[in-house]
Amino acid sequence: MNRDNAIAWSVEDLCVNYDHSDVLCHITFSLPAGAMAAIIGPNGAGKSTLLKASLGLIRASSGQSLFFGQRFSKVHHRIAYMPQRASVDWDFPMTVLDLVLMGCYGYKGIWNRISTDDRQEAMRILERVGLEAFANRQIGKLSGGQQQRAFLARSLMQKADLYLMDELFSAIDMASYQMVVDVLQELKSEGKTIVVIHHDLSNVRKLFDHVILLNKHLVCSGSVEECLTKEAIFQAYGCELELLDYTLKLSRGKYQGSC
């Protein structure tokens, strides 16, 4: 398959069921390589479940997900996954530098020695996200925004082709926000594929070129223009886009934190 024209992520008839209750129902879509995509939908829509089921972190009841035409186990080294902050044990005795160096494991292996070159590369990436001064700090001692940037740095260390990021913009202030946006734009300019679970519909048009709109089933997958219509938003959220944008602007503070 030509990597320049590949489908980076395809999902076919994916279903996930918890305790006899449908969480995701018959999800089918494909995402072209090089896209900058937002996964959006109301709370409980199955956004995080979609990522986890596609990566095999939770079991799907049916269907399949392929990355660059292959199962995840065959191409795991090409994929970087950034989990939600809430799922991380921030008390774990690990420094920021240690966390970033974990990004090497996909292409070096767990048991191979970390080299001086690896450490220098990790420090360059920490400088890129503004955390070089915190390299030796325990990860739980960072602010919310710094923690997000540390995990972003780990993802960058993986040198992946596809980045799957769960609530990347959660708990960051505006300075961190702009830094993260700049990094994403750099990745896109390098031909990388980026997928972000996102909550703020007011800036989807500015940040992304592709949308995956969910509410347990697939409402729309396509360009921002195709998916951010009144009809699609009403189908997913139960209200019109203008009202939803206004509501999200009022509540946006809960998604912002310290740097």
From Swiss-Prot:
Residues 9-241 form the ABC transporter domain. Keywords: ATP-binding, Cell inner membrane, Cell membrane, Membrane, Nucleotide-binding, Transport. It is found in: Cell inner membrane. It holds the Pfam family ABC_tran. SMART domains: AAA. One of its GO terms (molecular function) is ATP hydrolysis activity. ATP binds at residues 41-48. It comes from the Bacteria. One of its GO terms (cellular component) is ATP-binding cassette (ABC) transporter complex. It is a peripheral membrane protein. Belongs to the ABC transporter superfamily. PANTHER family: IRON TRANSPORT SYSTEM ATP-BINDING PROTEIN HI_0361-RELATED (PTHR42734:SF5), METAL TRANSPORT SYSTEM ATP-BINDING PROTEIN TM_0124-RELATED (PTHR42734). Part of an ATP-driven transport system CT_067/CT_068/CT_069/CT_070 for a metal. Probably responsible for energy coupling to the transport system. This is Probable metal transport system ATP-binding protein CT_068. It comes from Chlamydia trachomatis serovar D (strain ATCC VR-885 / DSM 19411 / UW-3/Cx).
